[in-house]
């Protein structure tokens, strides 16, 4: 083949010693003659390794690049620098055309260095799509989406486009105009002109996001008109531009109560991709759910999977396997991108699985893939890293009611121990198993910190500190439970106080690190292991104090939510020393007339003020307690006082 892709050839030269020596193993690169539908896909290749030669047949330059990645994975080099390859035939092609990530999370955006490293990672993982849509980029969204990027940011965009191309990744630049767009010819041209500015920076793939908005910008017919205009006047006229992508306002099934999706299906140009998160904002991806939306939008949807994104549980890391993905859904999606965490390096564990799923669904196994991901991301200490990751999987209670399996290798032993502990018995076998686990947890952070990947260590450092303390607390909890079975109360007290000190240290870390405005703190092992330790601590403490029946006011130690609004029922509260409140929702909150929301809290605390922040409310009802005092004809707060608590409920008219 004349002029094979230089990026791919560079990889092959790094792997094999390519020379003009007639005795060297020949390398032959040709175009694929087998034109079955699968091998016509971008990225498809046929790799044949025999004692006589290496044959690579490709569908396109991306296919050669992926074949080169496979050669790197297969090659083994001995101490003398000799490279060996296994003999065989590999016929390889992707199940999904567009595979990768969407940087679409709330919170701190990735750094430029993060993005460069991610693009290199995607190339190695055979992912071909990166959608740039940081929520906090004012030139992607309001207020500056109409304006050009400043010089520094424009130069960074150019760098990203270049790095993406070198790794055979489409850099997709997304615009988010819906917060303040006017459906006028002027603003239509503003979007078109901004696309032109990005084209001049080298961008060849584009998206328009209308997610998480309400009001005028959320009208399906107006959105479709704009997108069809962009399709005709930009996508079809500019050279080398990829298909246009849009994220709709009703991007999940739970919100699809109107004819919005049907309007898009009828009026939107069929060449435009439509994104979809599943049956709710954060949800597993099912074939049934895909077929449901595809009928509405009259095309295969482009999956935006909200995992391992953690902008709704920022005190947790989501380091577990990428499961909950239907292996039979390839035909029902046009693309598959995952929304990662703001911690780019830590996200690689889940993204490793996403890449394998989207490439070959039938062969994908989340559990074995997870083990491989831990080995890939942290080869210096893969077992210690696996221990850390499999105990940092679950987001905890959240408004989306999306939970993940955690500590599954140890959950049975933990429950067996606690079952007997509740009966005032000590299960020595379960204790031994849990002790070994907590010893592994105690040692894991030190092993992990030997990694050369300092960016990863910096991202997860507070959780490593907390994980180490959890291991020590777990060992001490089991020791405390054991001494509590005996007659030596002094020894039990000593062990109990040591455990209390460790839990206090964990609380200090939780209140010191990662103090973001939303879900503050550092949680580890929150589904199985931390509750295990806390239950033992509480149980032994109650026995020591002869206080099994505590005062009702003491039992109510936390504030809680009172509401009939489905979006708020499961939303965690933000609780500090002098305030409690609802955590901010990333999505639009929909409140129907007559619905209410409120709080309940301890009797010993007195409320001095109430603050409402509804910045996007169409009727602009932003109220504080002073509003009620100034407007006596408005309904007063409904007091639902009980002997043990105070609570306030606000009806919404």
Predicted regions and their residues:
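Disordered, acidic Ser/Thr/Pro-rich linker "stalks" and the adjacent N-terminal cap
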Residues: 532, 544-633, 643-646, 650-651
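Aromatic-lined carbohydrate-binding surfaces of glycoside hydrolases
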Residues: 102-274
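Catalytic-core regions of glycoside hydrolase
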Residues: 76-79, 104-105, 194, 200-204, ...
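Short boundary motifs at domain starts and secondary-structure transition points
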Residues: 89-95, 263-266, 601
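Short, Φ-rich (hydrophobic/aromatic) sequence segments
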Residues: 12-15, 70-72, 78, 349-360, ...
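Contiguous, structured surface segment used for ligand recognition
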Residues: 1-96
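Acidic, glycine/polar-enriched metal-coordinating patches/loops
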Residues: 635-638
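C-terminal functional modules
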Residues: 43, 364-564
């Amino acid at each position: 083949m004349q002029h094979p892709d230089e990026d791919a050839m560079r990889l092959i030269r790094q792997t094999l010693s390519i020379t003009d020596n007639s005795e060297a193993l020949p390398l032959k690169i040709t175009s694929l003659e087998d034109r079955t539908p699968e091998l016509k896909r971008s990225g498809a290749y046929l790799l044949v390794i025999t004692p006589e030669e290496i044959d690579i047949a490709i569908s396109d330059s991306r296919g050669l690049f992926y074949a080169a990645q496979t050669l790197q994975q297969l090659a083994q080099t001995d101490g003398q620098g000799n490279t060996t390859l296994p003999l065989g035939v590999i016929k390889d092609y992707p199940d999904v055309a567009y595979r990768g990530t969407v940087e679409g999370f709330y919170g701190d955006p990735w750094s430029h260095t993060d993005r460069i490293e991610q693009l290199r990672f995607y190339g190695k993982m055979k992912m071909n799509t990166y959608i740039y849509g940081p929520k906090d980029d004012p030139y992607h969204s309001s207020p500056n989406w109409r304006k050009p990027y400043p010089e520094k940011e424009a130069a960074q965009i150019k760098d990203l486009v270049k790095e993406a191309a070198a790794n055979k990744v489409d850099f997709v630049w997304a615009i988010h105009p819906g917060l303040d767009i006017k459906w006028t010819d002027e603003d239509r041209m503003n979007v078109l002109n901004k696309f032109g500015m990005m084209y001049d920076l080298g961008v060849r793939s584009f998206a328009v996001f209308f997610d998480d908005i309400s009001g005028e910008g959320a009208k399906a017919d107006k959105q479709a008109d704009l997108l069809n205009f962009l399709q005709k006047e930009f996508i079809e006229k500019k050279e080398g531009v990829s298909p246009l992508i849009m994220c709709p306002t009703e991007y999940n099934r739970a919100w699809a109560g109107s004819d919005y999706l049907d309007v898009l299906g009828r009026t939107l140009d069929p060449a435009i991709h439509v994104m979809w998160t599943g049956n709710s904002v954060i949800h597993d991806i099912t074939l049934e759910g895909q077929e449901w939306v595809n009928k509405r939008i009259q095309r295969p949807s482009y999956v935006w999977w909200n995992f391992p994104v953690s902008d709704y549980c920022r005190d947790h890391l989501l380091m577990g396997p990428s499961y909950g993905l239907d292996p039979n859904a390839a035909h029902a999606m046009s693309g598959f991108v995952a929304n990662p965490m703001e911690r780019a390096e830590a996200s690689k564990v889940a993204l490793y699985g996403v890449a394998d799923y989207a490439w070959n669904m039938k062969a994908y196994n989340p559990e074995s893939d997870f083990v491989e991901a831990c080995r890939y991301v942290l080869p210096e200490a893969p077992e210690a890293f696996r221990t850390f990751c499999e105990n940092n999987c679950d987001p905890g209670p959240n408004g989306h009611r999306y939970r993940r399996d955690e500590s599954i290798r140890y959950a049975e032993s933990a429950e067996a121990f606690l079952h007997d502990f509740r009966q005032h018995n000590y299960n020595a076998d379960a204790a031994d198993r849990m002790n070994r686990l907590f010893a592994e947890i105690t040692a894991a952070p030190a092993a992990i910190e030997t990694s050369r990947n300092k960016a990863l260590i910096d991202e997860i450092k507070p959780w490593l500190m907390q994980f180490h303390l959890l291991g020590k607390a777990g060992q001490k909890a089991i020791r405390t439970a054991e001494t509590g079975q005996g007659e030596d109360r002094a020894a039990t007290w000593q062990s109990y106080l040591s455990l209390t000190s460790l839990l206090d240290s964990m609380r200090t870390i939780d209140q010191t690190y990662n103090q973001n405005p939303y879900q503050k703190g550092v949680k580890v092992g929150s589904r199985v292991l931390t509750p295990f330790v806390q239950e033992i601590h509480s149980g032994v403490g109650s026995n020591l104090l002869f206080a099994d029946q505590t005062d009702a006011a003491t039992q109510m130690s936390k504030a809680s939510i009172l509401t009939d609004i489905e979006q708020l029922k499961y939303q965690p509260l933000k609780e500090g020393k002098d305030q409690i409140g609802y955590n901010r929702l990333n999505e639009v909150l929909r409140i129907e007339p007559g619905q209410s929301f409120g709080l309940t809290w301890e009797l010993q605390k007195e409320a001095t003020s109430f603050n409402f922040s509804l910045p996007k409310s169409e009727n602009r009802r932003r109220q504080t307690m002073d509003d009620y005092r100034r407007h006596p004809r408005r309904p007063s707060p409904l007091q639902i006082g009980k002997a043990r608590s105070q609570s306030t409920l606000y009806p919404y008219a």
